[in-house]
Amino acid sequence: MIRTLLMLTFWALAAPLAALIGFPASFIMGDVRVLYRLFMWGAWAGVWVTGVRVETVGLDQFDHSRSYIFMTNHVSNIDPPIQIPLIPRRTSVMVKKELFKFPILGRAMRMGSLVPVDRSNRDAGIEAVRAAKSVIEQGLNMAIYVEGKRSFDGKLLPFKKGPFYLAVECGVPVIPVTIVGTHYIMPKARFAIKPGLVKVIFHPPIEPQDFGDRESLMEKVRAAVESGLPEEFRHPASARADVRGKGTEAPEGTAYA
């Protein structure tokens, strides 16, 4: 609990400082990258002070000048502040609309082109996918936690179909990502953070010409993400078809759950 409070206190102190520097600099320069980098540094540093250390795999195997959709598993609230700062270029995410109500955070997220999503409203989910498409067309990356919510036991949940609709519509490469370790550090049912090692695996990009249809792309992403999980978090072969077959129909996606 102390480590969690330390992280939250650090963020509470760092956010106004980042805003004090980043907002004027962004307005003067007409570029939000200063603000973005400050907030990414703050997110990373906040995780670091808790004793969490991160190992990355595969960051050197894709072109950092291109836009990608990163499709990632989700087991902990600490996943986004670990993953997003690792990605070299500006990256947007879909986040709960409630987070936009916080004055400094909400303003920064709007300037950073983050996409609000209302998970209780199917039509709002569709609108969020359209907004995400617009963000990608601006040249930004998009990170999506394709299960739509956190997994309680660390195993993959059914994937939302919206992210795959988005990928096919935009025609940009998809990078499957596996996050390993946050289930132990801060699982869904616990607020306290334990120190430990997190591994973030960036799998090889899936190029648009290799997508096939949306179902085929979903299968490829799921296979890649699951391949990076420890054996105890992989579904038995006999159960995989059932899990894959339960994907929701609405185009949805959210970064936090």
Give the role of each language-model region:
Residues 126-257:
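Non-catalytic C-terminal accessory region of glycerolipid acyltransferases
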Residues 73-74, 110-112, 192-195:
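Short, hinge-like loop/turn segments at secondary-structure boundaries
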Residues 56, 70, 93-94, 200-202:
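Generic preference for hydrophobic
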Residues 50-57, 125-126, 182-184:
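Short gly/ser/thr-rich secondary-structure transition/capping motifs
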Residues 1-55, 107-111:
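A transmembrane-helix-recognition feature enriched in membrane-embedded lipid enzymes
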Residues 66-72, 91, 135, 140-144:
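Generic beta-sheet signal
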Residues 77-131:
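Membrane-embedded segments
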